[in-house]
């Protein structure tokens, strides 16, 4: 009888501990969800402003599917003039998912790129965040220069000893350029609706 009572008490104790831990975790999740989301939005807004500095009006985040892949994008204007889009594009690098924000102007040239997140090796692939590498894409005209690293016949200077990361970064940019063609066609065909969606702001291998 004492054994049964001891077992029952142990089970009740474990259940109580599990309940308390679950409640604490739920509470922490509720408390941190807001700040985390606020930080994410601020990071995106900063990236959009960095890759499309010539805009002062940015739409809410929209999505488009191209070849089975979904891309988030932000259409941008300078007052009444459409100036381009900031497009979220992700690929797999050496260490995991590599996510970029790619700015493309209305004429199709790249106005800038910025890393949103990565898991690349510090001191090697992580150098993809350095302007020494990323700045080469600014002003890029993909109709003139090939978006591929030089070792594969393209015009992109790879990061030393980080070919996989360099190729992944370049592929993310190339995919954004491809998505932009469909986005641009969609915006041009839906200009009235797009104008209504525009809001003030603009300030979201190794």
Per-region residue spans from a language model:
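Flexible, solvent-exposed loop/hinge segments and secondary-structure transition points
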Residues: 2-206
């Amino acid at each position: 009888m004492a054994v049964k009572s001891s077992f029952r008490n142990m089970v009740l104790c474990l259940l109580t501990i599990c309940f308390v831990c679950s409640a604490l975790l739920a509470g922490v999740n509720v408390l941190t969800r807001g700040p985390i989301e606020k930080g994410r939005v601020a990071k995106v807004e900063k990236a959009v402003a960095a890759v499309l500095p010539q805009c002062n009006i940015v739409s809410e985040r929209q999505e488009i599917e191209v070849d089975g892949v979904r891309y988030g994008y932000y259409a941008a204007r300078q007052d009444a003039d459409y100036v381009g889009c900031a497009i979220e594009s992700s690929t797999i690098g050496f260490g995991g998912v590599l996510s970029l924000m790619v700015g493309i102007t209305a004429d199709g040239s790249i106005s800038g790129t910025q890393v949103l997140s990565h898991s690349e090796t510090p001191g090697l692939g992580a150098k993809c965040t350095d302007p020494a590498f990323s700045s080469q894409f600014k002003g890029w005209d993909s109709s003139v220069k090939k978006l591929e690293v030089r070792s594969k016949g393209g015009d992109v200077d790879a990061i030393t000893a980080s070919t996989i990361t360099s190729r992944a970064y370049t592929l993310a940019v190339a995919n954004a350029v491809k998505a932009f063609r469909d986005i641009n066609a969609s915006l041009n065909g839906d200009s009235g609706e797009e104008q209504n969606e525009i809001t003030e702001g603009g300030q979201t291998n190794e």
